[in-house]
A protein has these predicted regions:
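Conserved N-terminal helix/loop that builds the PLP phosphate-binding region
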Residues: 1-28
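Active-site-proximal loop/turn and secondary-structure-junction residues that shape catalytic pockets
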Residues: 9-11, 104, 156, 189
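Conserved core of the PLP fold type I
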Residues: 24, 28-29, 34-182
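Hydrophobic, well-ordered secondary-structure scaffolds
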Residues: 176, 188-189
């Protein structure tokens, strides 16, 4: 059996990209409406944006209630990262460093370097334990220049699949805040 782990796309046992029944049904429903297909608003479908905010922040989040959350629908995960990287570059001081995990999805480096950032790595995977090098990660967050950006995989860390538990997330967020760092969450899955 061959397994292609290079791209986050599902292939069937014949190596073909299948049209899933749920996708076919959704397309049939859209086609049955005979509605015109215009451009979406610049920030995407408002109902989708609101649903994403509730999913990520909780439906009763004060951030949503106070209208402090901004959500924009993007073209795929890479498109969203590119928009975020460009936005950060525009508002970050010259010389700001972006830290990506070691190892990381290699597109992280390419996207942030293309936006004009210097990219470094923070310790993440511990090959000896097959877990997170948690102390190394915290030490890097604390030692980095304040205002540095830390790209964090919210779940399904790419490429290791090793995630932080809730208690570790609490410590990482406290360390980021205490050290004056900027978290940048990649929620790919």
């Amino acid at each position: 059996t061959k397994v292609n782990l290079g791209v986050g796309v599902y292939y069937d046992e014949n190596g073909k990209l299948p049209l899933l029944d749920c996708v076919r049904q959704a397309e049939d429903q859209l086609n049955a409406t005979h509605a015109p297909r215009g451009y979406l608003p610049i920030d995407g479908i408002p109902a989708y944006d609101q649903a994403v905010q509730k999913l990520l922040l909780g439906k009763d989040s004060p951030v949503i209630a106070d209208k402090r959350a901004v959500t924009a629908q993007a073209l795929g995960g890479t498109g969203g990262l590119k928009i975020g990287a460009d936005l950060l570059r525009r508002f970050s001081p010259e010389g700001t460093t972006v830290y990506i995990s070691n190892p990381s999805w290699e597109n992280h480096r390419a996207i942030f370097e293309a936006a004009g950032f210097k990219v470094e790595t923070y310790p993440y995977y511990d090959a000896a334990t097959h877990g997170v090098n948690f102390q190394g990660m915290l030490d890097c967050i604390k030692a980095a220049r304040p205002g540095s950006v830390f790209v964090l995989h919210a779940c399904c860390h790419n490429p290791t699949g090793v995630d932080l538990d809730d208690a570790q997330w609490d410590q990482v967020l406290a360390a980021l805040q205490s050290a004056g760092q900027v978290p940048f969450l990649d929620i790919a899955y």
